[in-house]
Amino acid sequence: MPDCPRPSPRTRDAADAAGPRGGAPRLATVADVDGMHRVRLAVRENRLSDPGRITAADYRAALETLGRGWVIEAQGQIVAFAIAYASGSLWALFVDPAHEGRGHGRALHAAMVEWLWSLGLRRLWLTTAPGSRAEGFYRRLGWQACGRIDGDLRMELPREA
């Protein structure tokens, strides 16, 4: 896979300056798996054609062995979550449609990226559907398209020097 071009510096916008409206991200635990899966099934884009394709065991492995996760709660319910692998891959970032537009995605993204950079990684990557709202979200945060994997768009975020 070719290296991505270096993104131009991004300026902070009003949403960045204000921070998330609502709860702040906290580390996820295996006790959060049901709530995370409920959010995953509620999304409008990137829906699972087979809800059984991602299992509780997948979430547990991601949280306990492969990486780390974060959740945002509102009124005692998980309304957004994200999971990143220690290898530098963003596995999931989803917000319940009823809670979109409140900065939860940006807050979760910031938590993931901060943790991954703390591991000494030089480049992060993810895949998403081309032309999706997720692609636009990641582009606005400095991610660059670097090719395709099984029809999905591969995007990378290099660490700034």
Where are these regions (language model features)?
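A short beta-loop-alpha structural element at the N-terminal edge
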Residues: 23-38, 146
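Conserved GNAT-fold acetyl-CoA-binding loop/helix
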Residues: 33, 37-67
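Conserved beta-strand in the GNAT
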Residues: 71, 77-94
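A short, internal acetyl-CoA/4′-phosphopantetheine-binding micro-motif in the GNAT/acyltransferase core
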Residues: 93-101, 128
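Conserved acetyl-CoA pyrophosphate-binding loop and the N-cap/start of the following alpha-helix
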Residues: 99, 103-111
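Conserved beta-strand-loop-alpha-helix junction that forms the acyl-donor binding cleft
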Residues: 125-135, 151-156
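Conserved active-site tyrosine of GNAT-family acetyltransferases
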Residues: 138, 143
